[in-house]
Amino acid sequence: MVVSVKVFKKATPNGKVTFYLGRRHFIDHFDYIDPVDGVIVVDPDYLKNRKVFAQLATIYRYGREEDEVMGVKFSKELILCREQIVPMGNSNMEMTPTQEKLVRKLGSNAHPFTFHFPPNSPSSVTLQQEGDDLGKPLGVEYTIRAYVADSEDDRQHKRSMVSLVIKKLQYAPPTRGQRLPSSLVSKGFTFSNGKISLEVTLDREIYYHGGKVAATVQINNNSKKAVKNIKVFIIQHTEITMVNAQFSKHVAQLETKEGCPITPGANLSKTFYLIPLASNNKDRHGIALDGHLKDEDVNLASSTMVQDGKSTGDACGIVISYSVRIKLNCGTLGGEIQTDVPFKLLQPAPGSVEKKRSNAMKKMKSIEQHRNTKGYYQDDDDNIVFEDFAKMRNNNADVMD
């Protein structure tokens, strides 16, 4: 069986410089982060003694673009890495197997490069916009770009520059915690004896995207009130650290009267199942995603993970967390009883059964989507499959080069 290597490519508008990347997603393993490794192919006749530079940049947008007035900006762009690719500054650079294949296939005009993310760099997150909002979405985005210039500080002309948006993501740790998240609350009532107790227990601490979240609810009614109905939510909590803003959105919910009313002296034990999905929140403003909703493999943003000994308060960028919220309606005079149980929503780790199942599903979808796609072709000599990045070109691009 011959295994093909998928490689993503994108060229400048004038076609003189082309990026090749072996992947679009780069994983933070906590003790190290996958390097950004690829190859740049340049037409030597186009350079005319100029140089090719490449950058790894992050753009952190924490406010709406339409609110930027009087020179006030609600975004920060940081250049994380910058390197001269042509002529190559480091001729002894160690290449990955994919880079070796590409250089062998593409010839002497192919130049490898490798960038490294700084430690503790935030994960890619995009906050979903409203339907009529045409500005850039809030979130953290990583871009790798290459351009032709006499020096690295020269103006970057759009005609001779190519940029690609990549994602930095986190996977679930290889070992799961043994503790089952739980919460116990009780409520008494004025001018009435007794209490209603609510206990919620989850069957695990870490859930994977696309999986069921199981919450077992135990209700003991030792009061004179009755529970009318039960509401179950999965809440996504978002913190934008730059402006210290926090908000919460439900990403899955259900309401039921099954087993209700729970009358005085009665008990109820029931397990509820919810599946938080990005596809069920397409039109909801402010939902945090790990990319743009138009992407075929987009998920809800994963929970923010930090190294042992640190708290999420030390994290930068956009901090994401999740919880299961249970509400009991005790009538007009009784009010509500509410409790939250936190959990983590993450990508399955490589090599896990869940990850293999997820990869198999994505591969099937990819095969179907690319059967009739012109931007997809295979080179049998080196078992390389090339796929074009979506071309996002500005209509008023600078034509100077």
UniProtKB/Swiss-Prot annotation:
InterPro entries: Arrestin, Arrestin-like_C, Arrestin-like_N, Arrestin_C-like, Arrestin_CS, Arrestin_N, Ig_E-set. One of its GO terms (molecular function) is G protein-coupled receptor binding. Gene3D superfamilies: 2.60.40.640, 2.60.40.840. GO terms for cellular component: cytoplasm. Transmembrane segments: none annotated. GO terms for biological process: G protein-coupled receptor internalization; signal transduction; visual perception. Keywords: Phosphoprotein, Sensory transduction, Vision. Belongs to the arrestin family. PANTHER family: ARRESTIN (PTHR11792), PHOSRESTIN-1 (PTHR11792:SF23). Directly interacts with light-activated rhodopsin thereby activating the phosphorylation of metarhodopsin. Inhibits the dephosphorylation of metarhodopsin. This is Phosrestin-1. The lineage of its organism: Eukaryota, Metazoa, Ecdysozoa, Arthropoda, Hexapoda. The gene is ARR2.
